[in-house]
A protein has these predicted regions:
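Phosphate-end processing signature that detects enzymes handling 5′-triphosphorylated RNA
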Residues: 1-207
Length: 207
């Protein structure tokens, strides 16, 4: 399985600081523009206390059936490792209902991995968090502004319901800024660690 490997820093800032920081970034990055989108992430319950244990998520970008992803994420030696694969709406429903036998022999390594972990550790759908984000790919990494973070009421059954009730998790006068910087390794090291094919960074960090 191939992973995007990156360092991550995050901090809450005020609305005024957000406006100034965004303007400075746009001036520095030239013609690059921020992408605005909504992301809902459903976390599968497991050992939440240990960041070194991999966590799994179903992610829906802009409530689009064409942008549903299964995500695996864990931290090792202060470096985040992340893998993701596209999922159809039908397959997403099967995963949520625990109908995952089809993943056992899938060509997609992440599906096989999820099947194994879900079977061994009895993973089950947990809470859904919604993020309203702005993201920009910079010359040296990715900047994300989380303008709103809400916990969706009703659990996984409301993953695709746009009018679902929610509880605010971020103060209204605050913005959570996240910076991700890719770990740069020589191609030969990448190939030894992840196989002969280099990871498509754009795909791995699509949200």
């Amino acid at each position: 399985m191939q992973y995007a490997m990156y360092y991550e820093e995050q901090q809450q800032i005020s609305q005024d600081e957000y406006g100034k920081m965004k303007q400075q970034i746009l001036l520095r990055e030239g013609e690059r523009k921020f992408e605005s989108y909504t992301l809902r992430k459903l976390k599968f319950t497991g050992n939440d206390a240990d960041e070194t244990v991999a966590h799994y998520y179903l992610c829906v970008k802009d409530q689009s059936e064409q942008q549903i992803y299964l995500e695996k994420k864990y931290m090792q030696n202060h470096i985040w490792h992340r893998a993701c694969a596209k999922v159809t709406k039908k397959s997403c429903g099967q995963i949520l209902r625990g109908e995952i036998d089809w993943m056992k022999n899938s060509k997609e390594a992440l599906f096989r991995d999820f099947y194994l972990q879900a079977t061994l550790n009895h993973l089950s759908p947990g809470r859904v968090i919604e993020y309203q984000r702005e993201m920009l790919k910079c010359k040296d990494g990715y900047v994300m502004f989380n303008k709103k973070i809400n916990c969706i009421v009703g659990g996984w059954g409301n993953l695709f319901w746009p009018e679902a009730m929610s509880i605010h998790c971020l103060d209204e006068d605050k913005v959570l800024v996240v910076y991700k910087k890719k770990v740069n390794l020589p191609n030969t090291i990448w190939e030894m660690m992840q196989g002969n094919t280099l990871l498509n960074e754009e795909k791995a960090l699509v949200f």
